[in-house]
Curated annotation (Swiss-Prot):
GO term, biological process aspect, one: carbohydrate metabolic process
Domain of life according to the entry: Bacteria
A molecular-function term among this protein's GO annotations: 5-oxoprolinase (ATP-hydrolyzing) activity
Task performed by this protein: Catalyzes the cleavage of 5-oxoproline to form L-glutamate coupled to the hydrolysis of ATP to ADP and inorganic phosphate.
Gene assigned in the entry: pxpA
Protein name as it appears in the record: 5-oxoprolinase subunit A
Subunit note: Forms a complex composed of PxpA, PxpB and PxpC.
Entry keyword set: ATP-binding, Hydrolase, Nucleotide-binding
UniProt organism field: Bordetella parapertussis (strain 12822 / ATCC BAA-587 / NCTC 13253)
Pfam family, one: LamB_YcsF
Reactions this protein catalyses: 5-oxo-L-proline + ATP + 2 H2O = L-glutamate + ADP + phosphate + H(+)
Recorded family membership: Belongs to the LamB/PxpA family.
SS bonds (residue pairs): none
Family annotation (HAMAP family): PxpA
NCBIfam families documented for this protein: PRK05406.1-3, PRK05406.1-5
Length: 252
């Protein structure tokens, strides 16, 4: 059986007059959209427009909840309790679910954004709170989380379906965590390097760290960041490479 992968992209992250990403163009290459819910980006009109665009392209709808940090784009860590994490996720997923329902659609998945995602990947209590929030809103939702992380463990523990996420444009550390963006080797900007990393993760179940170590991981869904300068080039090139290698592309 040939391997399969979901291609997801964070989008709907514009806010008012401030514009982010190239959503409409990227949508033709992905199978899942992680849509901002207002706390790091995504005003109500942007949420509505992004849901409509995703539906028009047959792309699965996902909520992309964040810490309450518009100024920092949700990328700054905050000290929050598990209860606060639960409440933040319920509030934001509920908001996007309402937008989807107004257009006759339902959400497919939830993927935390930025610092909330990274914190919960390591913090079991936060991971449990986020997964419980998702399950309490809709037990049919899929939890997208960093491959091999506390989020995946927490989802499985409560019977929530989980999709293990890998990244095309980020490097990995020996413990399977993403290299922090503050480090110079965190981002992959060369398309050929990104494609080689993607094929290794999808076909071989492993990734090479910048210092040459090999880390095992499972790849169910691949993130393509829509806010990078070459997002469209990456999305097109990665999808073409996957198809040429006989890898099916479908929502997780």
């Amino acid at each position: 059986m040939n391997p399969a992968i979901d291609l997801n992209c964070d989008m709907g992250e514009s806010y008012g007059a401030w514009r982010m990403g190239n959503d409409e163009a990227v949508l033709q290459f992905v199978t899942s959209a992680n849509i901002a819910c207002g706390f790091h980006g995504g005003d109500p009109s942007t949420m509505r427009q992004t849901v409509a665009a995703a539906l028009a392209h047959g792309v699965a709808l996902g909520a992309h909840p964040s810490l309450p940090d518009l100024a920092g784009f949700g990328r700054r860590a905050m000290q929050i309790t598990p209860q606060e994490a639960y409440d933040l996720v319920v509030y934001q997923v509920g908001a996007l679910a309402g937008v989807a329902a107004s257009q006759g659609a339902r959400l497919h998945h939830v993927k935390a954004h930025g610092a909330l995602y990274n914190m919960a990947a390591k913090d079991a209590a936060l991971a449990r709170a986020i997964c419980q929030a998702v399950r309490d809103v809709d037990s049919d939702l899929v939890l997208y989380g960093l491959a091999g992380s506390a989020l995946i463990d927490a989802a499985r523990a409560i019977g929530l379906r989980a999709a293990q996420e890998v990244f095309a444009d980020r490097t990995y550390q020996a413990d399977g965590q993403l290299t922090p963006r503050s480090q110079p080797d965190a981002m992959i900007t060369d398309l050929d390097q990104a494609i080689a990393q993607v094929l290794g993760m999808v076909r071989d179940g492993s990734v090479r760290t910048p210092d040459g170590q090999t880390v095992a991981l499972q790849a169910d869904t691949l993130c393509i960041h829509g806010d990078q300068p070459d997002a469209l080039v990456f999305a097109r090139g990665i999808r073409l490479a996957l198809e040429r290698n006989g890898i099916a592309i479908q929502a997780a």
